[in-house]
């Protein structure tokens, strides 16, 4: 959900001027002092070093739900009725984003502000080590975390915006866009350093670990291995509705397998036997000790965080207000695009345990004991991972707290990365072992050699609403064709009011009219340019001086 645009106010402006300028200016009047250690550019001890890096989370916490407003809305799976139709959520849902669209502005700027803060922290802690203020162990923990977070930020940025500026504590430009390969080289460098600096996973996923760095390396190499489009390639398709050709680089896919194997071989991670207990406040960040959560962003709620995690708030904004039992009818901020997403899965895999957690078609209200239905003609299904069911009456209470930690990486992703990379390399039978681990937990049939199509569908089964949708479409080069699947949805046809055999209340008709309009807009508006997001303005609307992406 969108918060007030003040966000961090003066703190953001201070970080912007401090971080961006100092990292991009190598010839200013102070450049001769860059290697001098003074009382002003050191921290006092190990705890202070770690605290300095932890300040970067003020730029990650506001993004936990915001990522969904690009990554999930720019797909066939999710639509948004957050506020007026001119607001940023509905705009992204309809593929009408531009450089001023708030979620693009917010994510892009916060990621770069976090990078600037990482850079300053690394430089300061390096000075502190030289000055004897910080131990080697303290340096490893703090700088390892800073490089981990910087790499994650650059990975998000290049996946969504392509070529982006690269600047570190050693210098660089905040406006000149680097090639895709140069951005990934920086990501790999940071994560390789983090892998060597960080300790092994100890059951607390809020702390980046050696295995979390290896998992991100596996993710990065899979993304890089699927040959992200260059600006020139996007330019060639920007105004059309044809997907580009899929291509890959096998050497990078081999590295994805290598790093996934490192995580697996550590023996420190495993799948939680109960899929439905991966989400919720009382299940967050490995509280059950099952060791599937590998890296999470900690949240304590809106009153404590820079911003709480609104993944629950946005998918379940108004609990049980679907018009039944005399209750009001109010639309959530994000909605499952149509019944078909539930129906198709149920037809394909009726025994998949994950379906009941992913799409709720009915929910019992613990306050009145009644069961509420989320299926046409009443409503569309609810994203179940956004409905906290981990503590007493959490279905009604958690949206007032927004305190659930966000999962960035879990062990299931490592297994599926390995399986997919092996399939892309033509080693399908080897992919069966990691692939079937997910299927065994889900209670569905195992396969001897998964196909690429089965791999793609498994990403849906396992990770719906976990901020992968458009990123996978970018990798597989099927953004346009996947979005155009909405033409098969119940409420896409203009005669939906009469052809489906339903009768609707006024509230229901208004809701499904908006569903219809958003499905139509997705189908009509998606273009090749949407393989990139628009380079946005700054948080105050200023021009950032970065060349715009094709088509915007």
Walk through the language-model features, giving the residues of each:
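Conserved, well-structured interaction surfaces
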Residues: 41-64, 85-161, 171-185, 189-205, ...
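Short coil/turn linking the two alpha-helices of tandem helical-hairpin repeats
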Residues: 158-160, 165, 202, 223-232, ...
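Elongated scaffold/linker segments in the mid-to-C-terminal portions of large proteins
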Residues: 41-48, 53, 57, 61-64, ...
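Bacterial Sec-dependent N-terminal signal peptides
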Residues: 3-4, 13-47, 151, 187, ...
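Short, surface-exposed recognition loops and adjoining beta-strand edges that mediate ligand/DNA contacts
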Residues: 67-84, 199-215, 226-318, 444-456, ...
